[in-house]
From Swiss-Prot:
GO terms for biological process: cellular response to potassium ion; ethylene-activated signaling pathway; post-embryonic root development; response to ethylene; response to reactive oxygen species. This is Ethylene-responsive transcription factor RAP2-11. One of its GO terms (molecular function) is sequence-specific DNA binding. The lineage of its organism: Eukaryota, Viridiplantae, Streptophyta, Embryophyta, Tracheophyta. SMART domains: AP2. It comes from Arabidopsis thaliana (Mouse-ear cress). Probably acts as a transcriptional activator. Binds to the GCC-box pathogenesis-related promoter element. May be involved in the regulation of gene expression by stress factors and by components of stress signal transduction pathways. One of its GO terms (cellular component) is nucleus. PROSITE patterns: AP2_ERF (PS51032). It comes from the Eukaryota.
Length: 253
């Protein structure tokens, strides 16, 4: 009695014949063998090609595994493979593309951080400029051969005495450091004295000179303030520097 095989048994026998002991190798329905390698660490899945025999496909897998994972990886054969084969060049190009894509992704995140750094630098620079502007004072510096005197030299007249801050000459014989209270007291005292007419006239002349000096000084202060507010520059060619002395104004010859 002959043993007859059913179609299911034939399919099982065929599938058992298709199974191989090689890693990364499988057979197509057409009968050819294909090799494929996966690397979850580097996120690579590479099609190695179609081969006539299972041994050729297994050797292609071994070569790709050694290039991707190193020589200690699991292989189908213990043989060493050349590094200049067409498959090795293909795998190296794939690795280079993966590294380039990774670098591009990292560079895409850099502009955001650089813009943030620029904004921080701009804010800190603006703050430092504001602080520098608020602490800046007027000083006497030469610029383009034009001397700009320090505005701090110009001050208000003292109340205790008539010590003028300017070097303008006054009338000869005039004591410009006489206190106002003393001058006023002497004035009232001499007004009550009918026998000191000459002294009264002398004090009146002194008071007139004091009034003229104060008027000239106040006018100069107003002029300096206007110059500081509008131009902040003292020009040596300005007519203010050519003013005649008070002795020439009040005692013309």
């Amino acid at each position: 009695m002959e043993h007859q095989t059913t179609p299911k048994q034939k399919t099982k026998e065929k599938s058992k014949g298709n199974k191989t002991k090689f890693v990364g190798v499988r057979q197509r329905p057409s009968g050819k063998w294909v090799a494929e390698i996966k690397d979850t660490t580097q996120k690579i899945r590479m099609w190695l090609g179609t081969f006539e025999t299972a041994e050729e496909a297994a050797r292609a897998y071994d070569e790709a595994a050694c290039l991707l994972r190193g020589s200690n990886t699991r292989t189908n054969f213990a043989n060493h493979f050349p590094n200049n084969s067409q498959l090795s060049l293909k795998i190296r190009n794939l690795l280079h593309q993966k590294q380039s894509m990774k670098q591009q992704q990292q560079q895409q995140h850099k502009p955001v951080s650089s813009l943030t750094d620029c904004n921080i630098n701009y804010i800190s620079t603006a703050t430092s400029l504001t602080t520098t502007t608020t602490t800046t004072t007027t000083t006497a510096i030469p610029l383009n051969n034009v001397y700009r005197p320090d505005s701090s030299v110009i001050g208000q007249p003292e109340t205790e005495g008539l010590q003028l801050p300017y070097s303008w000459p006054l009338v000869s014989g005039f004591n410009h450091q006489i206190p106002l209270a003393q001058a006023g007291g002497e004035t009232h005292g001499h007004l009550n004295d009918h026998y000191s007419t000459d002294q009264h006239l002398g004090l009146a002349e002194i008071e007139r000179q004091i009034s003229a000096s104060l008027y000239a000084m106040n006018g100069a202060n107003s002029y300096y303030d206007n110059m500081n507010a509008e131009y902040a520059i003292f020009d040596p060619t300005d007519p203010i520097w050519d003013l005649p002395s008070l002795s020439q104004l009040f005692c013309p010859t």
